[in-house]
Amino acid sequence: MHAWEAPGSLSRALPLASSVLMLLLSCLWLLGAGPSLRLAPELLMEPWQVHRLLTHALGHTALPGLLLSLLLLPTLGWWQECHLGTVRFLHNSTVLALATGLLAVLLAGLGVSGAAGGCGYMPVHLAMLAGQSHHPGWPQRTLPPWLLPWLLLALTLLLSSEPPFLQLLCGLLTGLAYAAGAFQWLELSEQRLQVLQEGVLCKSLARCWPLRLFPTPGSLGELPVTYPAGVRPATPRPPYLASSDSWPHSDGSAQLPPRLGPGQLTWKNSERGLDWAGSSFASATTMWAALDEQMLQEGIQASLLDVSVQGSQSSLWLPKPSVSSLRLQQLQHMGFPTEQAAVALAATGRVEGAVSLLVEGLVDTEALVTEGRSSPAHCTGTGAS
């Protein structure tokens, strides 16, 4: 799967924020707007110049610095946006750019020469890399993750003279502080993130092509993945370890309940059902909620298997009042067959539970939804695929 392909997407789409940022940096360079965005402490006293604390990252005055920033956006920025989500990626980038500007101005005010006066996006790249390289989902390479930001800092100093060294160092230190939890109070909560992603604008951008808004993996607004009939991934993806903050400075870690080993939790079998419920494994409370959902899924599967064992001894028929037409239409719009959707709804009574059964391929029943109670519809049985 390519880095810019969202799970379950039918066509390739580029991450929206990183791609638009590349266009913006290029346009500002062509317009010669770099000097007017320079982080100059002497100009920040004017009210209309405060924007430089944030917009200093968008301007460039040296071509090597611009090319290096543009090169890192598709190689590093796309990966970060796909794994953080577009909204959280924009939020983290904005917070780190502003914090870097404030730290540079503070050092310049203390008399440290060269701490400010430059511009460029490289300090934000360093800050994002320093914070994201400690994330559990970061690809394991030969080099240790903590060494990557320092190598990028040395490479930037060799290839470009912009921004100044101290401004680059401010960006790297800001990222390390972010990874340590210094900005945890500025993090987007899961509720606020869900509200933003469920807005009309975000929903519209999530359907766009070739630039697409990526939802935060594991968030409540992310629907489970559906595959066409007969198409299944070779190896299931591990569930996302979602938490209130995507970077690893949470206070606690998930623990298993007493007398329950990790082998008893079939996370792979119920992966998409847990994703639909938006379960978060970052605390013990959410772990118990996930366990309750897991036990419910196992009970539903056992009840369906009991129906398949009876076979020809009893026939399955679904009266129409037992199946909600609105919920059935929702499943039909997702692309599920009507007969299987009706059986899953009758077994669970909830759309999310029915989606979980259908996605896992546990419903293989041909049933008919009847108008009354007098004409039963025979089925071929239910079993695990």
UniProtKB/Swiss-Prot annotation:
Q: Which residues cross the membrane?
A: 13-33, 58-78, 95-115, 146-166, 168-188
Domain UBA, first and last residues per copy: 322-361
Q: Is the Cell membrane keyword given for this protein?
A: no
- What is one process in the GO biological process aspect for this record? MAPK cascade
Report keywords, A-Z: Membrane, Transmembrane, Transmembrane helix
UniProt subcellular location: Membrane
Residue ranges of the region described as Disordered:
238-264
| Top-level lineage group | Eukaryota
Membrane association type: Multi-pass membrane protein
Q: Write down the Pfam families for this protein, in alphabetical order.
A: Rhomboid, UBA
According to the UniProt record, one GO cellular component term is: membrane
Which molecular function term from Gene Ontology is one that the record holds? serine-type endopeptidase activity
Q: Output the InterPro entries linked to this UniProt entry.
A: Peptidase_S54_rhomboid_dom, Rhomboid-like_sf, UBA, UBA-like_sf
Q: What is its main location?
A: membrane
| Protein name from the UniProt record | Rhomboid domain-containing protein 3
Q: Which gene encodes it?
A: Rhbdd3
